[in-house]
């Protein structure tokens, strides 16, 4: 927009008149042209002042929008009203035809009974659900101006009190999709004391991230004159305070926790979950697998309110999780954005054959030489021992790298994540502890040094890049041992619309026996050690270490015999 034009509008200079030496009365400038300019400038200002600018949906919705704008503009001209904030540019979904067109635009598949209409913009929440103004202001301050597809569907469903099973790609805004309705419902239930909302996350890092987002959205929201909306993450220190009655559990309205810590506090009768009205499982496929299912079941048994609303969110929803959801939910609605086993379409996916383990290190170094190793970068491995080994190899290559895994303390992990987020650290090596939910802004490259054991693990790993509409790249290194394990990866690549090479189309379908082997981690033999030292040299070193240990053992035995004599 030309700012100088705005500042000088209303002034018109007749150059020919000046050349003839005649004076010009600027007060009699061309009013018709000025009106046209003013009209164009006003329309531009209106659009720039509209915080809730909407995406292009389909021609029917756009036509309705254009008619609405024209009618509003005509009425403003007739009434000579200069209040630009009254001009509405939002797309309101009022019919099933509009809803169908919107869902078709983002490939949404919604199944269930009595499904409410989606929202076309955040302004829809004001007219349909009387969204709290303080919550709306917090959305604007944090630059959340346009709902993503999962938010368009999940928010009205939750605000209508429906149980929900939601699946959407990584980085698509699932956290906001359950936080907005949850906070709105807590505000509406301000007369009830105690914990009203509960969010369960499989890892502490993800729980912390959800807590930080929740704090931003609940800023300056008071349930009465002196009591702000209280959000807490159930840390070790908070658990101790609750057990020792230093703090009452009635203080908090919303608690975010990992399963085991929550169960520990509940079993000690330090936290009452009987009043919880909204229960949300983030990364539901992980929380309902064999690792967490018993803990999740204990949590469900502790939440005794029969009217409690339950929601499950994840980027991947296996059929087993769907069966569990249908058994514990009341008339749930199933929302799938895209394909439930597909990765984010903004991610360029690539497979690199390395022959053997030594070839993987060579491939990493080739990426560096070819300029494809562009930070920030995350490298995933299958075990802590292998993550440590790769860290030492890359550290000696003078790459700005660090490693994070379950053996690191909570403080160490937090510091490493903070360094990575601020750009101080370029490359982060980790296990699957960081594969889920953690939102790192602007990750350019994800490297699967070890092939993931399942398609779900692969989708979550590469989902650390390509978030928030940005593009990203994912590279998976594989060897002869991974000939079976890469089959699910190739299927994900096809479903995500990636270009695949000819041999990928000709690969045989994965058998039931191979699926079971992959799930049990038996799809390949034990991997070789990560090292650039030749195998012959490693065997020599091992033989030498064995000789030293044997010598020490003989020395101890002889000392024991002498002391006995």
From Swiss-Prot:
Residues 155-335 form the Helicase ATP-binding domain. GO terms for molecular function: ATP binding; ATP hydrolysis activity; RNA binding; RNA helicase activity. Residues 516-529 have a biased composition (Basic and acidic residues). The Q motif is unique to and characteristic of the DEAD box family of RNA helicases and controls ATP binding and hydrolysis. The gene is ROK1. ATP-dependent RNA helicase involved in 40S ribosomal subunit biogenesis. Required for the processing and cleavage of 35S pre-rRNA at sites A0, A1, and A2, leading to mature 18S rRNA. Interacts with the U3 snoRNA and is associated with the 90S and 40S pre-ribosomes. SUPFAM superfamilies: P-loop containing nucleoside triphosphate hydrolases. Its main location: nucleus. It comes from Candida glabrata (strain ATCC 2001 / BCRC 20586 / JCM 3761 / NBRC 0622 / NRRL Y-65 / CBS 138). One of its GO terms (cellular component) is nucleolus. It holds the Pfam family DEAD. InterPro entries: DDX52/Rok1_DEADc, DEAD/DEAH_box_helicase_dom, DEAD_box_RNA_helicase, Helicase_ATP-bd, Helicase_C-like, P-loop_NTPase, RNA-helicase_DEAD-box_CS, RNA_helicase_DEAD_Q_motif. It catalyses: ATP + H2O = ADP + phosphate + H(+). Residues 516-565 are annotated as: Disordered. It is found in: Nucleus, Nucleolus. Its EC number is 3.6.4.13. This is ATP-dependent RNA helicase ROK1. GO terms for biological process: endonucleolytic cleavage in 5'-ETS of tricistronic rRNA transcript (SSU-rRNA, 5.8S rRNA, LSU-rRNA); endonucleolytic cleavage in ITS1 to separate SSU-rRNA from 5.8S rRNA and LSU-rRNA from tricistronic rRNA transcript (SSU-rRNA, 5.8S rRNA, LSU-rRNA); endonucleolytic cleavage to generate mature 5'-end of SSU-rRNA from (SSU-rRNA, 5.8S rRNA, LSU-rRNA); snoRNA localization. ATP binds at residues 168-175. CDD domains: DEADc_DDX52, SF2_C_DEAD. A motif (Q motif) lies at residues 124-152. Keywords: ATP-binding, Helicase, Hydrolase, Nucleotide-binding, Nucleus, Ribosome biogenesis, RNA-binding, rRNA processing. Belongs to the DEAD box helicase family. DDX52/ROK1 subfamily. A motif (DEAD box) lies at residues 282-285. Residues 346-508 form the Helicase C-terminal domain.
